[in-house]
Design a protein with these regions (language model features):
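Aromatic-anchored transmembrane helix interface
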Residues: 32-40, 57-71, 79-104, 116-117, ...
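Loop-to-helix entry and N-terminal half of a specific, functionally important transmembrane alpha helix
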Residues: 9-12, 335, 339, 346, ...
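Transmembrane alpha-helices of multi-pass inner-membrane enzymes
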Residues: 162-163, 359-360, 366, 384-435
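A membrane-periplasm/extracellular boundary helix in multi-pass inner-membrane enzymes
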Residues: 190, 213-274, 295-297
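Long extracytoplasmic/lumenal interhelical loops at the membrane interface
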Residues: 138-139, 143, 281-348, 367, ...
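Hydrophobic, aromatic-rich transmembrane alpha-helices
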Residues: 36-51, 159-169, 353-374
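Alpha-helical transmembrane segments of multi-pass inner-membrane proteins
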Residues: 110-137, 149-214
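Transmembrane signal-anchor hairpin modules in multi-pass inner-membrane enzymes, especially those
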Residues: 1-71, 106-112, 116, 166-175, ...
């Protein structure tokens, strides 16, 4: 039962939206993921209690804190309770998947089966991207089978490249890992994602230092050849992005000239600009505008935001909630660039941001610690990839699009990976105590 629910949750996370879009599955089944998580959570907790054991509630104080913040925000903003429930449900549903997984006492064999299943689903995105590329060319709609959420075309490859690099350097240098990694670089380029121009150089240098040098205990000054190769790889990939992305070259076409100065100027303007009506259309300008309004509106607004659900579409009243979001955007003067941090700030204020940020920050520390302690090559590679994933998600939380934590796909993968690292860390702690 638990395995079937797991397989269903992640199949829907990576392929479900395409099935809904083309009518292979009826739209009401879109709530199947949440029902499956509830069932899995209930099975895990009740099984734990049935064996006379205390369930693990890792990071649960952060959830209680945001519930308290939500209650205060509802009071100050006169928000309907149902809107708060819908908002918290979307934000924390995969955290409860995390709690379910860490309470199921999954053994190593089962975890490896789950990892392999997810690898198949993730690699299965590449043929879908190739098919869409054949029919659509280089475009933001050239994405995987998850069907929506264009920003995933940048974030998902970043995560996969961390894992493939870790397994190549720390487990076994299989060519398959390189091929999959290159496939996801292709994935992001044909998906026309500008952000990877800046993500990849940082990621490749992080892989070189933290996974290759630290992981293999190599002196970076004695392996300058690998560093040179990394820099060369950064140059090739960056040049390819500039050449193929219409918005990053002066000619505004696929196959334009490679002009880093133009691309940098465009990126700065893109992230800081406002349109002719004064609406912010960049992530940095939108972040500045949101926190400026929260600050200027007084202490209660700064701490508790505009109310849970203020920026969330309700399935009970989609038209009404869309109008509410439009009015809020009009009041703030924002048009584009809402990050996960921004969205939480809008609904829950600064205290909500602090409460939720405890999760990605804690996961960074857990992954870093486990990466240092893990001795098994397979699991050390997993910990190394997860460390990269955790720090990337912390960055996405602050500076990138909100599907990083509010979506259907990446949060499922993220909380699964963090659950596995936590399970391994518990096992390591138990082993050290026994010794």
């Amino acid at each position: 039962m638990t395995k079937a629910l797991f397989y269903l949750i992640f199949f829907l996370a990576l392929f479900g939206n395409t099935f809904f879009l083309y009518g292979f599955l009826p739209e009401p089944l879109a709530v199947t993921t949440e029902i499956s998580i509830i069932l899995l959570f209930a099975i895990a907790i009740l099984s734990k209690i049935g064996r006379g054991q205390v369930p693990r509630w890792h990071l649960f104080p952060g959830f209680l804190m945001i519930c308290f913040v939500a209650a205060c925000s509802m009071f100050f903003n006169q928000t309907e309770p149902v809107r708060a429930v819908f908002s918290l449900r979307l934000l924390y549903r995969f955290y409860f998947l995390y709690l379910a997984l860490i309470n199921l006492d999954l053994d190593e064999k089962t975890l490896k089966k789950f990892n392999f299943y997810l690898l198949i689903l993730l690699v299965g995105q590449l043929p879908v991207v190739a098919y869409k590329f054949y029919h659509q060319g280089i475009a933001e709609t050239t994405m995987g089978a998850y069907g929506r959420g264009g920003s995933l075309t940048a974030m998902l490859p970043v995560a996969m490249i961390f894992y493939m690099s870790a397994y190549y350097f720390l487990e076994k240098p299989r060519k398959l890992y390189l091929i999959i990694g290159l496939g996801f670089i292709f994935f992001s380029i044909v998906g026309a994602k500008r952000a990877v121009l800046f993500f990849y150089p940082i990621e490749f240098l992080a892989i070189y230092y933290f996974i290759y040098c630290k992981g293999k205990q190599v002196d970076p000054f004695r392996k300058a050849g690998v560093l040179i190769l990394s820099i060369f790889m950064i140059g090739i990939v960056s040049a390819s992005i500039l050449y193929f992305n219409r918005t990053l070259n002066p000619e505004q076409k696929v196959g334009g000239s490679i002009d880093p100065a133009y691309a940098l100027s465009y990126a700065i303007d893109y992230n800081t600009r406002e349109n002719e009506l004064g609406y912010t259309t960049g992530r940095f300008s939108t972040t500045r505008r949101i926190f400026s309004v929260l600050y200027n509106d007084g202490v209660s607004r700064l701490f508790f935001g505009f109310g849970p659900g203020a920026y969330t579409v309700s399935i009970l009243d989609p038209q009404g909630s869309h109008r509410q979001i439009y009015q809020l955007e009009k009041r703030l003067g924002i048009g584009y660039g809402v990050t996960s941090m921004n969205r939480i700030a809008l609904e829950y204020g600064v205290l909500g941001v602090v409460a939720f940020a405890l999760i990605p920050i804690a996961f960074c520390f857990i992954c870093r610690r486990q990466y240092r302690l893990e001795t098994d090559p397979y699991w050390r590679a997993f910990a190394g990839g997860s460390m990269g994933f955790a720090f990337a998600m912390l960055a996405f939380f602050v500076i990138y699009h909100f599907p990083a934590f509010w979506g259907d796909t990446l949060p499922a993968l993220y909380f699964y990976a963090m659950a596995v690292v936590y399970i391994r860390s518990r096992k390591a702690n138990q082993t050290s105590v026994q010794q």
